[in-house]
Amino acid sequence: MTMKKALLGAALLLSPLLAMAGNWPVTVKDMDNRTVTVTQEPQRIILQDGRDILTLAVLERDNPFAKVVAWNNLPKKQDTETWNVLKRKWPEADKILDMKFSDQGNVDLETVISRHPDLMIAQLRAKPSLVQSGVLAKLEALHVPVVFVDYELHPVENTMPSIAMLGKVLGQSDRAQDYINFYQQRLDTIHQRLAKVEKKPLVF
C-alpha cells in the first residue's frame, strides 16, 4: 500500500475527533529547512500537488476541500479510483479551480492569485521549478506563506515530519499525532513480524 493510499484509508477509518483550536501565528521548519511563519489560521489554501488532499483528509476530516481554493487535480488525472472515492464523499471537489500546476512551474498565476490564497502547500521536488518560474518569489512578495512537504524524495525521513508540520500550521496537531501514532503502530507490527521470519540461505 502506498503512503497516499494509507492516508486516504486512515482519513476514512479513524473515528472523528473534536478539532483542537490552534494558536496563530505559528512558526515552523518545513521540509526544505525554511523557517515559515503563518500569521493566521489558513482559510484559502493552494495545493501545488493535488494528491496532498489526502493529508488534508487526515487533518480536516469533516471536509478536506473546505479551505482549498485552487489545486492541481492529480487524482483526477492519475488515480481515478482515489478520485472517485473523494468525489463521492465530497462532491464539491469537482468545482475547485484546477490550476494544472505542473512540476515545471507552469500555471496561470494571476488566476490563482485572484483566489486570494493565504497558504500554499507544495512538494519539495517542485521547488526548483517554483523558483525558476518566479512563482515562489511572487507569492512571497504578496506575503502568502509557502510550506514544502515531502513524501517522495526522502519518504522515510520526511513523511511523518511533513504531517506534523501541517498539523501545526492548520491547528490540527492532535489529529496529526493521532495519525502518526496510527502509522507507527502498524510499522512496528510489520517490523515485529519480519523479525520472526527465519532467514533462508540464498540459492544461486
Describe each region flagged by the PLM:
Residues 1-10:
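Bacterial N-terminal signal peptides that target proteins for export
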Residues 20-204:
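N-terminal ligand-binding lobe of clamshell/alpha-beta domains
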